[in-house]
Amino acid sequence: MSRVGKLPVKIPEKVKVSVDGNVVKVEGPKGKMHFPTNPLVSVQVDKGEVKVARQDESHVAKGLHGLTRTLVKNALEGVVKGYEKGLEINGVGFKAEVKGKDIHFTLGFSHPVVFKLPDGVTAEVDAKQTKLTIRSVDKHLLGLTAAKVRALRPPEPYKGKGIKYADETIRRKEGKTGAA
């Protein structure tokens, strides 16, 4: 049996969980979300707990068992606490500005770059306009959005200019040594 999948997930206070066929719906103080589950795995809600069980002992079902339990746990944690990811912008003149559901970047191109935030994701920029914080209740959507923002101008290895995750370290390279 899956060591992760066999553990029940406790439902926190002020959170509603419902299972409608193969769709799990979670509502909490920070928001609501839903996600589909595979037919090889069943999800039941009883006595303040969510339990995940698999239909058979196939290799795929065993893998989906632990995955589904972790997705349920992440959804419950997301609607209670929420998730956030920090990004840093390095480079002369590089900055970001949030305008409604858009983030306007100045990244050294001949034009400003406009990034549209998906529904359920919010962004905030510090006073220096170099630190960007992205928040969401959906951990998966947050990671995808942060990766897309980073891909606008990934950090380069010589000077480190670009957009990087706050906890990321860039392996720096030494430049060419000029022969005189």
Swiss-Prot record:
Q: Keywords in UniProt for this one? A: Ribonucleoprotein, Ribosomal protein, RNA-binding, rRNA-binding
Function of the molecule: This protein binds to the 23S rRNA, and is important in its secondary structure. It is located near the subunit interface in the base of the L7/L12 stalk, and near the tRNA binding site of the peptidyltransferase center.
What gene does this protein come from?
rplF
Annotated PANTHER family: 60S/50S RIBOSOMAL PROTEIN L6/L9 (PTHR11655), LARGE RIBOSOMAL SUBUNIT PROTEIN UL6M (PTHR11655:SF14)
* Molecular functions per Gene Ontology: rRNA binding; structural constituent of ribosome
Which organism encodes this protein?
Anaeromyxobacter sp. (strain K)
Q: Which GO terms describe its biological process?
A: cytoplasmic translation
What sections of the protein cross the membrane? none
Cite the record's note on assembly: Part of the 50S ribosomal subunit.
Give the SUPFAM superfamilies listed for this entry: Ribosomal protein L6
User: Does ATP-binding count among this protein's keywords?
Assistant: no
Respond yes or no to whether keyword RNA-binding is given for this record: yes
Q: Name one GO cellular component term.
A: cytosolic large ribosomal subunit
What's the protein name?
Answer: Large ribosomal subunit protein uL6
**So what family is this one in?**
Belongs to the universal ribosomal protein uL6 family.
